[in-house]
């Protein structure tokens, strides 16, 4: 009796611990009991517990048809397993299912019932008492729904290692096996769902959203994960609010105010339906429309929110739903529900009343029978429903479940129901593994197996962790190390049904968590219906899109998603909208006008085909042609006096160097290459130095010839042709050394300059060393300066040697060109640098060619009469007379000044005719003064040998060459006449040479002694002040020569005058002339 009493006491405690009556549970006996937790109601009624009496369990309100369907799915799966011969044969599964009322407190009440029963069962009281009402232990629990509820349940069940398989709790916190040791689930965790939400926002190019989350273990972790994903994608969150079904009205209104004032059109919601319902109701009351709701799977298909009267607010919602499954026979099972037939389901009675809005007779504590049901109907009566305060009519019992549209019968997309079905089968397959376990291959110590008849919860948990089976849909079911079951999501869009006006969930895409990143999301935009029945994707950005060619610019104090569009700078581009930065174009490209792409830069250099390049090329070719023409003329007329007088060999070399100068300019035209860059400056420098070296040697040689007396063998030896070429080579060799050092140490190279202009690449030559270029040009200018000095010094030599004057002009042109070149070279860039240097080379080359050779070519071709030996001698004699006359004029002025100081008087010299004969006694006879001033004539006759006294016939002499030169001195003009006796050239030269030597002996220190042998009228007393500069002997060889003369030394004034047969000087009316003659 004692044990019997104890048994009844424990059973009573167990019964009381549950705090549930028969109508608040679904229960069926079996060999193995499975527990179930389902939200048959959405919440509990608020009650003030003032503790004036014994507290009672709160009442559940607002019936949940979908929760009842989920419960039906568990019962259907258990009955299907019990009827299956292949799965757990000879064993029966029972169940104990409780209503959580979507609250933690109710769920914990049910969980305590499971735990207490297991503890009582562990005492093995059956051995001591006959307990017919003994209930086996609950070896596993299916549930709960919300993550917050499952968290509380898991903490309690985990203490006793009772496996919990949830069908709808997706919080990622539940994957923590250190805290939730016995928790498993047949739904993916929210980590994938949050990532999928961020992918959708990125897909539609939204970046300005708001977030709302339930203030529980489902909403907070889910929205936190979403924030992390949004930050990685540069998605900004305008507001973030927490809600709860227990929030007061003021809190709800504050959240609604935030939503109403926000510019974000997209709102991401991590919440369950019950928690979100109060907020949606307030939004509907305020008629806030135009928002796009992005729903998590917990409310994406919630019947609380998906109501037709809310559609103008929530229409167009994009939500995530679990992959729909198929449960064969489940539809028929749902249709068979009836209070009289569902004897083990205490929730069927309330379901029937809520479905048909009627009430059933309150009966006994147990399930209603048909008689009781009918008797209650006959007796009538009424009661207040726990979900309504209105009186309802009695139910007839003949109502047709198919005639009423409720969420219970919405079996088209079985998602949560299928997860419940899968959870039950997972536990069944774990029990099957225990049932079929072979000793030695088990999961326990030493491969042992559990006893299926005495199986414990922890043993089932062990087999669940190693579960692997194939579902009825052919999918492999296995839990990972975190107890999660991987799965995919369907993307649904809320539409309004045209048939009955209800909200339907149309599948518009899917999210595959197993695919590669970037390939997981698929959306069919054509199927989406947005808020307001629009097909256009709504705009939910803080700023308008920045078009291609612009970038996003940060606004101070604003989130990164709020920006201004800034045009890309030149040289950068963006080819996409909302570019965060502009990409820099490659070096050889530049941005187009709109900065949307890069186009190839224009390549610019001094091209052969452009007008400027063509013009320079034509001028260079013209210079080459003219130089070649001059060279041809000089070769053809190489034996004429004018060619010989210019030193034929040096002239040929000079013309060759000018050819090189003109040719070197062509290296500056065309696209610069490394080899052209290394060749053009040395070619130009060496060519010009060779040219100027030739001019320098020629000018210096002529100057020395004209300053010398009658040329000696010394002059001929040291100023021979070999020495001239040696000097030219030495001068040129210095330039070659400079170029060689330059090319070895810092060789020039082609260079693509991107910095001068943005849209143009200038291909130029990088000189390598500006110092080397300075040395090259500086050395050239140094030689040119020396050449200019000698040319200027010999500018007054005889007219036929007047190339010194033209060389002076050419050197002036050379200096002007290159002095102008320096600032022009420094101030230009790109192709104009080469153009400036080409112009300088051509200008200098044309100056040298024109000044030195054009006059000679003109005489050779068009004035052949001047290209004779007589012309050369005539101009040379005139030059000698000029020198003597200047000396005489200077001395006459000095004598006049002396006479004036002594009181003497001077009169005009009368005109006279003087004849001078050469003899040894009186080489300079004094002329007789005449009384009357007449034109004067000075005649020199060469002494003739004595002839016999008897007259003899004289042979007719050949007419001798004769020339006249007018010389102007002050106010007077002197006409100089000169004739030559060619047959007596040698004798005359010998005689005059002897006479010259006698004069030199007397006037060795006089500056005019070089001309005294030629001018018998010249005074023997020299002016000590006369210098070489005063004689005007600064110039180059420019006169005509006798064909037999090979050297300019033969054209010196002394030799020319000594070769003359006679000369006559006449003039009149000039004191200067008279003084010159009488002196």
Swiss-Prot record:
Cellular compartment(s): Cell membrane
Binding site for spermine: 238, 240
Residues covered by region (C-terminus): 855-1079
GO cellular component assignments: plasma membrane
Superkingdom of origin: Eukaryota
MF (Gene Ontology): amino acid binding; calcium ion binding; G protein-coupled receptor activity; protein homodimerization activity
Phosphoserine sites (modified residues): 892, 899, 920, 1062
Location of region: Arginine-rich retention motif: 890-898
Region (Ligand-binding 1 (LB1)): 22-188
Residues reported to bind phosphate: 66-70, 415-417
Transmembrane portions of the chain: 611-636, 649-668, 675-698, 723-745, 770-789, 806-828, 833-854
Binding site for Ca(2+): 81, 84, 87-88, 100, 145, 170, 188, 190, 231, 234, 297, 489, 557
Entry binding sites for L-tryptophan: 147, 168, 170, 297
Location of the region described as Ligand-binding 2 (LB2) in the Swiss-Prot/TrEMBL record: 189-324
Family, as annotated: Belongs to the G-protein coupled receptor 3 family.
Reported function: G-protein-coupled receptor that senses changes in the extracellular concentration of calcium ions and plays a key role in maintaining calcium homeostasis. Senses fluctuations in the circulating calcium concentration: activated by elevated circulating calcium, leading to decreased parathyroid hormone (PTH) secretion in parathyroid glands. In kidneys, acts as a key regulator of renal tubular calcium resorption. Ligand binding causes a conformation change that triggers signaling via guanine nucleotide-binding proteins (G-proteins) and modulates the activity of downstream effectors.
Name of this protein: Extracellular calcium-sensing receptor
Organism whose genome encodes this protein: Sus scrofa (Pig)
